[in-house]
Amino acid sequence: QHERGIERPQRVCGDQLAIFEVGSTLYLLLSDGMGTGEPAHREAAMTVRLLREFLEAGIEPVSALRTLNAALMLRGEEGGGFTTIDLLALQRPTGAGTLYKYGAAPSYLKRGGCVTRVTGQSLPAGLQQGADGPESTRLSLQAGSFFVMVSDGVADETDDEWLQNLMAGWSG
């Protein structure tokens, strides 16, 4: 909302987060509905709810994400929206994980003093054509390492040096 060139803060956030376990897999899910306010909130909330239901029903992450992308594409034809998705599937016993991305902002893995930026080039879910996507990256989280997912507005690929420096200096 704009009034005389001044943006008024939104009361509702378009970002949604879920953390849940299915068997020995821990899922971290971040979705950012496109746009602002209530419409963005609804898109992200629906995305998180459906994806969580698919995964809890035993559907593999790639199949669940592709199904969701197809459903969002159909909704888009009827005036629905689209959303970014970051999904980390982490195997609790080993720390091995896979990060899936649909149009999401960079994510960051810190291991020792090294921070690695993990990016993707795919479009948001609902805009990605065909069977392309999601992009996936294999990760290994070991004792003392940590992983950070952010939505747009926190950092992007051209302006995230401050975040990488902050993470590199953090020992927590």
Language-model segment annotations:
Residues 1-34, 39, 46-49, 134-137:
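N-terminal entry segment of metal-dependent catalytic domains or homologous docking segments
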Residues 8, 27, 38, 42, ...:
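Cytosolic nucleotide-utilizing catalytic cores of signal-transduction proteins
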Residues 10-23, 83-85, 117-159:
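Acidic loop->beta-strand submotif enriched in PP2C/PPM serine/threonine phosphatases
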Residues 29, 101, 147-149:
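Residue-level marker for buried hydrophobic side chains located in beta-strands
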Residues 34-36, 104-107, 114-116, 155-156:
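Short, surface-exposed beta-strand-loop junctions and turns on beta-sheet-rich folds
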Residues 41-112:
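Catalytic core of PPM/PP2C metal-dependent serine/threonine phosphatase domains
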